A protein has these predicted regions:
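Conserved ABC ATPase signature
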Residues: 97-101, 105-107
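Short coil-to-helix segment of the ABC ATPase nucleotide-binding domain corresponding to the Q-loop/switch region
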Residues: 57-65
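Helix-to-loop junction immediately C-terminal to a conserved catalytic motif
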Residues: 17
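A short, proline-enriched helix->beta-strand linker immediately N-terminal to the Walker B motif
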Residues: 116-120
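Hydrophobic anchor residue at the start of the ABC signature
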Residues: 111
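Conserved ABC ATPase "signature" region
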Residues: 33-35, 68, 75-93, 144-145
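Single conserved hydrophobic/aromatic residue that forms the stacking wall/gate
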Residues: 161, 168-169
Length: 169
C-alpha cells in the first residue's frame, strides 16, 4: 500500500487488524466478514514500524504471548516459537531481552511474532523504515523468502515509492 503521510494507510491497516472500527462498510477476509471479530480472533499478524516488542519480556515470551492469548498449550507453543525463530534465523536468542538485540534482530523478532500463530494475513506498517539501507535490503529478502516459503499474504505500507518498489512481494 503506497501513499503520502496522512493518506490513511495506517488507519486502513488498523481497521484490517481490528484496532479501529470502520465508519461504513464491512471488512472481509477470505470471503468472511471480520468487521465485528476481536483482533486476537482474526488470524492476522501485525508488524509495527517501531517493532512493538514488550521490553520486560524475553524473546521467547514476546513470541509466546499471542499463543497464550489464543490458549495454545505450552508444548505446542514451544514448537511454534522454535519454528518462528528458525524462520528468522534467531535460534538461541530465546532468553534475550529486546534491549539486548540490534535493530535488525528486534525487527526479526517482530516478524516472527507476527507469524508464530500461523496467520492468514500479515500486516506490516513501514516495517523497514527504521533500518539502515543494508539491513533494510537484507530484511526485504528475508520477508520475501518467508512469504514464498509459507505462502502467507503480506500487506506492507510505505509512504515513499522508492521503498514501495523494493518491498513488492
Amino acid at each position: 500500500m503506497l501513499g503520502p503521510s496522512g493518506s490513511g494507510k495506517t488507519t486502513c491497516l488498523m481497521m484490517l487488524a481490528g484496532f479501529e472500527t470502520p465508519t461504513h462498510g464491512e471488512i472481509y477476509l477470505d470471503g468472511n466478514v471480520i468487521s465485528n471479530i476481536p483482533p486476537h480472533k482474526r488470524g492476522i499478524g501485525m508488524v509495527f514500524q517501531n517493532y512493538a516488542l514488550f521490553p520486560h519480556m524475553t524473546v521467547y515470551e514476546n513470541l509466546a504471548f499471542p499463543l497464550r492469548v489464543r490458549k495454545i498449550p505450552k508444548d505446542e507453543a514451544d514448537k511454534k516459537v522454535d519454528k518462528a525463530l528458525s524462520m528468522v534465523s534467531l535460534q538461541g536468542f530465546e532468553a534475550r531481552m529486546p534491549m539486548q538485540l540490534s535493530g535488525g534482530q528486534q525487527q526479526r523478532v517482530a516478524v516472527a511474532r507476527s507469524l508464530v500463530f500461523d496467520p492468514q494475513l500479515v500486516l506490516m506498517d513501514e516495517p523497514l523504515g527504521a533500518l539502515d539501507k543494508n539491513l533494510r535490503e537484507s530484511m526485504q529478502y528475508e520477508i520475501k523468502h518467508i512469504h514464498e516459503s509459507i505462502g502467507v499474504t503480506v500487506v506492507s505500507v510505505s509512504y515513499t515509492h522508492l521503498r514501495a518498489h523494493e518491498t513488492i512481494l
